[in-house]
Swiss-Prot record:
The lineage of its organism: Bacteria, Pseudomonadati, Pseudomonadota, Gammaproteobacteria, Pseudomonadales. It catalyses: L-cysteine + L-glutamate + ATP = gamma-L-glutamyl-L-cysteine + ADP + phosphate + H(+). Belongs to the glutamate--cysteine ligase type 1 family. Type 1 subfamily. Its EC number is 6.3.2.2. This is Glutamate--cysteine ligase.
Length: 532
């Protein structure tokens, strides 16, 4: 029964979107990519240098910033309708960055290079303005709460939105009672629920972190195996980055990743950013007269909440993410569980992107029953099974309370995603999405084609440790970007962006009024005002 009901809603929606009048709608999905990567020395060690001034201000440059550490770059593309253009934009950012990196490299995988002692990992610095200091103190709080080592893991964030005009069309066809905005938000939450159910598939297909540098765990207990003196791994792992790795945030344990409507999501976040957590209270916000964390609550700010996918809305100046969501609803989703593929210069390619579009469209348009505690638990354990042992022959997952082999379920899911790939091809012309889906089917049939298997195979073939393999890949990608510099006018655009961002930061700092403590106080108050 269930299968046919699934298809009924999906078939209706496919038919509606396949009508000639609506077909071009799907060309208006938007795609943005954020790619994080560590700067490393020629020897593959963490670069201890400040963020290169030639890349502009990490505070105000919209395309090149820093994530947690001064050494952890983040490249941000604009949101564009064609992912080929998004990737072309990401490529240009890489080429510009390489023109300013001197003898440093961008580290190719998600898991970090051999790291120095915790105290020697530099926290990203954003200058003396109040907002710059706020970002710095927030990162000091993360160090205090979770340690710096964890914060050096890099990933790819894939931002995706469906066309705004799609929602009124579906809403009318389905007789939804409520506002357009409510329908749009509840549809995105439905996408997120399905993503929770099926994201294990992305980890099998794109997980690329089966091994890591042995020093990463800092001598703590773990369940990993020793591959060589410098490398820990699990033989069937797909993504140790997304596994628990022995780090559990007890403070965040009460926050469920499963929610059935936007209000319950914003409520739980509002509570978390306003509820003190005893171990943090014990430390306090100051030590020796210096700020060490923004507050002593479960979360300092919303972004501290760790999840595989986030509902998002572009914020206005001074507005908090949660306020934007409550005021204007969900605008797009941010997929946060994608590993950087160390074989690809940008860590992601067009094939992956085209498949992600079909996958996310399937999550959005398919029936999405509400999540119960039970189905939420199954989704979490399926995800954790796949990241730790996704390539284990005969691995079983839980589907609707019944065991099912990963390969069988994966093949069935791809079969169901195929009509969405076909619809995207129909809309865009060509067969790129169906071809991208075929490439994933090949990985399901043969696990040696997965990036995680290929990483282990490459290390074995070259008799390399994780760090040696990663440095070799980093050098190859550096050569790829450096061998073909940007055209002069493109280079000039980035130079101008860097210059104007530095001027913007200087202006912010010059015109700063008011004391930092007061600034933090009013920032806190902005969330408390909506928490009651």
């Amino acid at each position: 029964m269930k299968e046919s009901k699934l298809s009924e809603l999906l078939n209706r929606r496919l038919a509606l979107l396949g009508e000639r009048a609506n077909l071009s709608l799907l060309e208006q999905c938007l795609h943005g990519i954020e790619r994080e990567c560590l700067r490393v020395t020629g020897e593959g060690r963490l670069a201890q240098t400040p963020h290169p001034e030639a890349l502009g201000s990490a505070l105000t440059n919209e395309q090149i910033t820093t994530d947690y550490s001064e050494s952890l770059l983040e490249f941000i593309t604009p949101a564009l309708p064609d992912p080929a253009d998004t990737l072309a934009s990401l490529d240009k950012i890489h080429r510009f960055a390489y023109s300013k990196l001197g003898n440093e490299y961008l580290w190719s995988p998600s898991m970090p290079c051999p790291l120095p002692a915790e105290e020697d990992i530099p926290i990203a610095y954003y200058g003396t303005s109040n907002i710059g200091q706020l970002k710095y103190v927030y990162r000091k709080g993360l160090a205090l709460r979770y340690g710096k080592t964890m914060q050096c893991i890099a990933g790819i964030h894939y931002n995706f939105s469906l066309p705004e005009k799609l929602w009124p069309l579906l809403k009318e066809a389905e007789g939804f009672v409520g506002t357009d905005r409510d329908f749009q938000s509840s549809s995105y939450i439905a996408l997120i629920r399905n993503f929770r159910r099926y994201s294990w598939l992305l980890m099998y297909l794109f997980g690329a972190s089966p091994a890591l540098d042995a020093g990463f765990l800092r001598g703590r207990a773990h369940q990993l195996e020793q591959l060589d003196p410098d490398t820990l791994y699990l033989p069937y792992a797909t993504s140790l980055r997304m596994s628990d790795l022995g780090y559990q945030s007890n403070a965040q344990a009460g926050l469920t990743p499963c929610y059935n409507d936007l209000a319950s999501y914003t409520d739980s976040l509002r509570k978390a950013v306003a509820t003190p957590y005893a171990p943090y209270v014990e430390v306090g916000t100051h030590q020796d007269g210096e700020w060490v964390q923004l507050n002593t609550n479960i979360l300092q700010i919303e972004n501290e909440y760790y999840s595989n996918i986030r509902p998002k809305r572009v914020t206005y100046t001074g507005e908090r993410p949660i306020q934007a969501l409550m005021a204007r609803g969900i605008q797009y989703v941010e997929v946060r569980c994608l590993d950087i593929n160390p074989f690809l210069p940008m860590g992601i390619d067009l094939t992956e992107s085209r498949f992600l579009d079909a996958f996310l469209l399937y999550c959005a348009l398919n029936e999405s029953p509400l999540l119960t505690n039970n189905s939420c638990g199954n989704a979490t354990s399926n995800f954790l099974s796949v990241v730790k042992e996704g390539r284990r022959p005969g691995l079983q997952l839980q589907r609707d309370g019944q065991p099912v082999e990963l390969k069988e379920w994966a093949a069935e899911l791809l079969e169901k995603i195929a009509p969405l790939a076909a619809l995207l091809d129909q809309s865009h012309g060509g067969d790129a999405h169906s071809k991208a889906l075929d490439a994933q089917l090949a990985k399901v049939k043969d696990s040696s084609l997965t990036p995680s298997a290929q990483v282990l195979a490459a290390m074995a073939a070259h008799k390399e440790s994780f760090a040696q393999f990663s440095l070799r890949q980093s050098q190859a990608h550096a050569e790829f970007f450096r061998s073909e510099p940007l055209a002069a006018e493109e280079q000039a655009k980035f130079e101008e962006l860097a210059r104007s961002s530095l001027a913007q930061q200087a202006e912010l700092e010059q015109n700063e009024v008011g004391d930092f403590d007061v600034f933090v106080g009013s920032y806190q108050a902005s969330i408390l005002a909506i928490s009651n």
